[in-house]
Design a protein with these regions (language model features):
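Residues that define the transmembrane beta-barrel architecture of outer-membrane proteins
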Residues: 27-29, 57-63, 99-105, 150-156, ...
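Short glycine/proline- and aromatic-enriched beta-strand/turn motifs that initiate or cap beta-hairpins
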Residues: 21-58, 62-68
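Transmembrane beta-strands of outer-membrane beta-barrel proteins
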Residues: 29-33, 84-86, 105, 120-128, ...
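Residues on the lipid-exposed face of transmembrane beta-strands in outer-membrane beta-barrel proteins
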Residues: 33, 63-69, 107-113, 126-130, ...
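Outer-membrane beta-barrel channels and translocator barrels
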Residues: 26, 70-72, 114-119, 165-169
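Transmembrane beta-strands of outer-membrane beta-barrel pores
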Residues: 35-41, 69, 90-94, 128-136, ...
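Repeated loop/turn-to-beta-strand initiation elements of outer-membrane beta-barrel proteins
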Residues: 41, 73-76, 168-172
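Extracellular loop and loop/strand-boundary signature of outer-membrane beta-barrel proteins
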Residues: 49-53, 93-96, 142-148, 185-192
């Protein structure tokens, strides 16, 4: 299973800029789709098997759809910070029936850290938003869940990835992704949930 997950992860973070167009202010528009298999970090007994099914919770699969925009590299301020992009995203996180499959809405920003060539670069991206639809702690129906205490949580994510420009319209990305879900102690219990994807 781990080997299969590793093989899948090589192509898991595929970003497909479906279109880009030039408008009067020289802005490039992009649409990206990602698939990120992830491991749940066992930071709580509930995740290690302390639940009704006596089941260790190991995996998460996240699917995202993102809209991004950026200045063309040859036009200022794009020339100052080449390759910087920002936008909005929508994600579905597939966990299990005890945690549910929440939907995240978030803002993101990213940029190259190092350009190895005109087509290959090392990049970062951060996401900040909200995740909706958790099966949170409930004294009657989900009493063992001390991880998520509410239906809505904050969603924070940081990615480090290699981008390979296949053409003007298509990129292939592969890297690592760390995510955190928490309601910021607005309700208890709230130990939070952490995942790591590749």
């Amino acid at each position: 299973m781990d080997l299969r997950l590793s093989v899948i992860s090589i192509v898991a973070m595929i970003a497909l800029p479906v279109f880009s167009q030039e408008d009067s202010i020289k802005t490039v528009h992009r649409i990206a789709a990602d698939a990120v298999p992830a491991t749940i970090f066992h930071t709580n007994e509930f995740l290690r098997g302390g639940n009704e099914e006596i089941r260790t919770m190991n995996h998460d699969m996240t699917f995202t759809l993102k809209y991004a925009f950026m200045n063309r590299d040859e036009v200022r301020p794009g020339a100052i910070h080449q390759g910087v992009y920002q936008g909005v995203g929508l994600a579905r996180h597939e966990f299990n029936r005890w945690l549910a499959n929440p939907i995240s809405v978030y803002l993101f920003q990213g940029a190259p850290i190092v350009n190895f060539s005109r087509r290959v670069s090392l990049n970062y991206e951060w996401n900040l938003g909200m995740a909706f639809g958790w099966n949170g702690y409930d004294e009657q129906s989900n009493p063992e869940n001390k991880v998520i205490g509410s239906k809505v949580t904050a969603y924070i994510d940081a990615d480090l990835y290699v981008r390979w420009m296949l053409s003007k319209a298509f990129d292939l990305n592969a890297g690592i992704s760390l995510s955190h879900f928490s309601n910021g102690n607005t309700t208890y219990p709230n130990m939070g949930l952490n995942t790591g994807g590749i």
